[in-house]
Regions:
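N-terminal, positively charged/glycine-rich alpha-helical extensions of SAM-dependent methyltransferases
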Residues: 1-15, 29
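Conserved alpha-helix/loop element of class I SAM-dependent methyltransferases that forms part
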Residues: 22-43
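Class I SAM-dependent methyltransferase SAM/SAH-binding core
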Residues: 48-102
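A short SAM/SAH-binding and catalytic strip from SAM-dependent methyltransferases
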Residues: 109-123
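A short glycine-rich, Lys/Arg-flanked "PGG" loop and its adjoining helix->strand segment in the class I
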Residues: 124-136
């Protein structure tokens, strides 16, 4: 995974992400609700969020919880100006880094990541490694995308991430964690035209692994 390219694409999309990322917003709200339901308040004291972006999930979470300390992380330092309202709170801090290095303080009660780990080189290794950062009774909560994500575009370009199925993830995680909740859901977006699809992907940074621009032939094929 070219992290430099991914960072550059998301940095370019940071201004439009919060407006255009409709699916990610739905996921963020559902995940925040699930954490409130399945994780006791004592498990939300010291929190680490991986891949916070512009704070979409963060704000949803903070409407439902009041952690004593919240460390926000993202690959892109360019997101920090979009977090200024959150960082005005002395309990909340931001650090830009590649989260896969797992260079974070231990003693976390909760590690969360919303719609981010699909961009990791070794998501399973990262998720297993989070165990050593958690307290003995700590929780790991995350959402990601599955193999059916943007399949219409993938069928044409073959540009795709190595998405994991829910079963693949639960099989791996069962060795390190007791799974208290898992869910898979298909969310559908409709667009007025094929070009609107591509615009949406660009404005949400989802073109992060494609190195070249679309050719005229690819564009014509996609629009048919």
């Amino acid at each position: 995974m070219d992290k430099t390219l991914i960072r550059r694409r998301f940095a370019k999309a940071v201004g439009s992400y919060s407006i255009r990322a409709d699916v990610q917003r739905q996921i963020a709200y559902h995940m925040a609700d699930a954490i409130g339901k399945y994780i006791p308040s004592g498990g939300r004291r010291n929190v680490l969020e991986i891949g916070c972006g512009t704070g979409m999930f963060t704000r949803a979470f903070l409407h439902r919880a009041t952690p004593e300390r919240l460390l926000l992380n993202d690959l892109c330092p360019e997101v920090e100006p979009y977090l200024t309202d959150l960082l005005a709170n002395k309990r909340i801090h931001f650090a830009a880094s590649d989260a896969e290095a797992l260079n974070f303080p231990s003693g976390q009660n909760l590690i969360v990541s919303c719609s981010a780990i699909q961009w990791f080189d070794q998501p399973e290794k990262f998720l297993a490694g989070c165990r050593k950062l958690l307290t003995a009774d700590g929780y790991l909560a995350f959402s990601t995308f599955g193999p059916q994500n943007v399949k219409e575009v993938v069928s044409l370009t073959s540009d795709t991430l190595p998405y994991r199925s829910l079963k693949e993830l639960t099989d791996v995680l069962s060795a390190e964690y007791q799974i208290v909740y898992s869910r898979e859901e298909k969310l559908k977006l409709s667009f007025a035209s094929p070009l609107e699809v591509l615009k949406h992907l660009k404005e949400t940074g989802v073109t992060g692994i494609r190195r070249q621009s679309w050719t005229r032939g690819e564009l014509d094929d996609f629009c048919r």
